[in-house]
Structures are given as C-alpha cells and as structure tokens.
C-alpha cells in the first residue's frame, strides 16, 4: 500500500508548498511505476508458466489421441460385426448373444486439468487473441469428446443389458429389434467421436495462427 506522510517541518511559503507537492507527486509516480513493474513481471511469469503447462498437457493428449484413434477403429469393426450378426439372426434365427461384442476397448480420457486451472487463475486474459483462440478451439473439442464418450458408454451399457437378457444367447425378435436400434445409435456415436478425434488431431498439428482457417473451412462445409 502506498502511504503519503505529512511534512515534518511547517511550510512557510508557496514555493516550499509547491516543492513539497512536486516531491509527493514524483514519489507517487515512482511508487506506482514500481508497483506496475512488479505486476507486469508477475503476469509475464504467470503467462509463461501457463504456456509451459498447457504445452505439456497437449503433448500428453497427443499420446491419448493416438490410443483413442486405435480404440475407435476397433470399436467400429466390432459394432459393424454386431450389426451383421443381428440382421442375419432376423432371417436365420440362431443363438448370437455370446457372439455380440460391446465394449469401449482401451479408451483413454483426455486431459484438461491444466486448462481448467489457467481458466481460473486469469492467465488466459494475458494471452494474445490468436493464441487464446488456439487453446479454446482444442479444448472445446476435447470437452465435446468427453461428453460424447459418456453418452457412448451409456448406449453400450444398454446394448450389453439387452444382449444378456437370454442366458443361452437365443434373443427374441423384439430383443433383436431393440439391439439393432441401439447398435445403430452406437455406430453413429462412434462415427461422430472419430470425426472429433480427427479434428483434434488436425488442430494439434497446426500452428496457432492456422486455427481460424480450419474453423472457416468447417463452417463452409
């Protein structure tokens, strides 16, 4: 806190008064300048730290993304095989319950703890517009991935429950119809997740200034 102290000696003339006022003004300006300098370097350090931590987190997410792309490829093959079995069972009834595979595989949750932290501590307000836009674009995509993954998990659990209704694997025509519907929903979710992963992959390979161009192309399509 900046404090202004009264003069120790009595002021006897206007000249002394103005000299005293000038000294106070200069002192205040110096104090404010020093304070602003401290704040500037604090913000600069805070921004540099945020950049380092976000860079490290996105590096981890690149590894997570590679695993998740493998997982959705496997899931796509499994769900397509399930759909083929279900359609075949409609025309040629046979025990298929044990042959159906509904799983999330080796799906990994993307990381966003650092992003959530820097949103709270004010570091984002210190970034240039293009840099902020870059991180917002990527982490909004990651947020949607998390949301869609949760919804996918719920549909897969429903499909598993239906497939387990018959211990011997002989599903009723109604069970098969329900499974076809749910499996179609799972296929759509997996396809959408694959698209989101590709968008994340594309963004992680781009430079900060290229992100607006990506969004422009997506909006045109």
Residue ranges and their predicted role:
Residues 1-15, 36-221:
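Long, hydrophobic alpha-helical segments that serve as membrane-spanning/inserting helices
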């Amino acid at each position: 806190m900046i404090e202004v102290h009264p003069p120790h000696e009595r002021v006897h003339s206007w000249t002394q008064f103005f000299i005293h006022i000038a000294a106070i003004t200069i002192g205040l300006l110096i104090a404010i300048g020093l304070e602003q300098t401290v704040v500037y370097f604090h913000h600069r350090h805070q921004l540099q730290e945020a950049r380092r931590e976000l860079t490290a987190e996105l590096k981890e997410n690149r590894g997570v993304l590679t695993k998740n792309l493998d997982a959705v490829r496997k899931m796509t093959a499994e769900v397509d095989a399930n759909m083929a079995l279900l359609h075949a069972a409609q025309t040629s009834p046979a025990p298929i319950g044990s042959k159906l595979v509904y799983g999330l595989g080796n799906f990994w949750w993307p990381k966003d703890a650092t992003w959530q932290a820097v949103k709270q501590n004010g570091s984002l307000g210190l970034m240039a517009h293009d840099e902020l836009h870059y991180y917002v674009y990527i982490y909004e995509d990651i947020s949607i991935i998390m949301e869609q993954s949760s919804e996918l998990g719920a549909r897969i659990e429903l499909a598993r429950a239906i497939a387990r209704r018959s211990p011997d694997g002989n599903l009723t025509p109604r069970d098969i119809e329900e499974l076809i519907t749910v499996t179609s929903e799972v296929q759509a979710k997996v396809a959408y997740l694959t698209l989101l992963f590709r968008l994340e992959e594309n963004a992680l390979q781009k430079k900060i200034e290229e992100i607006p161009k990506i969004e422009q192309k997506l909006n045109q399509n």
